[in-house]
Amino acid sequence: MDRNRASARLTVLLRHLGCRSAGTIIAHHTSGVGSLASFHPQQFQYTRENNVLSLEQRKFYEENGFLVIKNLVSDADIQRFRNEFERICRKEVKPLGLSVMRDVTITKSEYVPSEKVVSKVQDFQEDEELFRYCTLPEILKYVECFTGPNIMAMHTMLINKPPDSGKKTSRHPLHQDLHYFPFRPSNSIVCAWTAMEHIDRNNGCLVVLPGTHKGPLQPHDYPQWEGGVNIMFHGIQDYDKNNARVHLVMEKGDTVFFHPLLIHGSGRNKSQGFRKAISCHFADANCHYIDVEGTSQENIEKEVVDIVRKKYGFKDVTLKDVWTFRGRVVKGERINL
């Protein structure tokens, strides 16, 4: 896509969303159900017909690979998630399998139990309070539009993006989430990502490249950043820099659903506060595992397996084993994953 086409695409996209400034999407309400009677189901590759999404919403996701639903998660639920995260940071609870991550710039001498040294917790499937996010009816109602009725919660995170230290390590390189997942098909996987407070470019909002979900999985590796890179923050090594970029400005409770091939990332947190969001990747329980040997995903397989072996002392663990352990059925029945 050349620069002119990218610019035209972005203009149409922003006009559709009613944005006032180029390069920024302000999350807006997208309720309402449109008739699909005149639109043949075979024309939809990425969404399923269940009378939740309007025709306009389905077309938007099909074309762009993401959809923002405003004010989806309540303030009360978000406060509960925040409280539980703080308990984890203080080491008052230690859920099985949970990974607590710190920014690469924080030295061991700064490991004081508080949210100020924790940049992310992931794999909270054994934390009853945080995992409630993955079972919220308002979340699953939309997830089913992409996965169908048998839904697995596969990957969970609560992100606490810290104020940048000046080394720009709080940013997340552009990447595709499918790079981390050894299961397919990609069209039956979706991420739900909920803002836990106001999020904009100043505190490191998501940036997406609309339409890139239609392309293939790209090779990923660690970017060569002078200030260092956080563990597992792989990025795409070569992508079309002429692609339009859209920054998602979101309010507390707003939720974006996006395809695992959508290229996205986030900027550094230039504010003095911690930017929080909670997310889960869901998949159709009918998805199947693949062997990533000989593919661009070999590097992430080796890294994940090495971490699990060192953390738990397992000798013969595979990437499939890791994801089978993480996965939880949240609606319908468990089938393949």
Swiss-Prot record:
It is an enzyme of class 1 (oxidoreductase). Its cofactor is Fe cation; L-ascorbate; ATP; Mg(2+). GO terms for biological process: fatty acid alpha-oxidation. Pfam families: PhyH. InterPro entries: PhyH, Phytyl_CoA_dOase-like. Keywords: Dioxygenase, Iron, Metal-binding, Oxidoreductase, Peroxisome, Transit peptide, Vitamin C. It catalyses: phytanoyl-CoA + 2-oxoglutarate + O2 = 2-hydroxyphytanoyl-CoA + succinate + CO2; 3-methylhexadecanoyl-CoA + 2-oxoglutarate + O2 = 2-hydroxy-3-methylhexadecanoyl-CoA + succinate + CO2; hexadecanoyl-CoA + 2-oxoglutarate + O2 = 2-hydroxyhexadecanoyl-CoA + succinate + CO2; octanoyl-CoA + 2-oxoglutarate + O2 = 2-hydroxyoctanoyl-CoA + succinate + CO2. GO terms for molecular function: L-ascorbic acid binding; metal ion binding; phytanoyl-CoA dioxygenase activity. 2-oxoglutarate binds at residues 120, 157, 175-177, 193, 266, 275. It comes from the Eukaryota. The modification N6-succinyllysine is found at residues 59, 108, 252. Fe cation binds at residues 175, 177, 264. Interacts with FKBP52 and PHYHIP. This is Phytanoyl-CoA dioxygenase, peroxisomal. It comes from Bos taurus. The gene is PHYH.
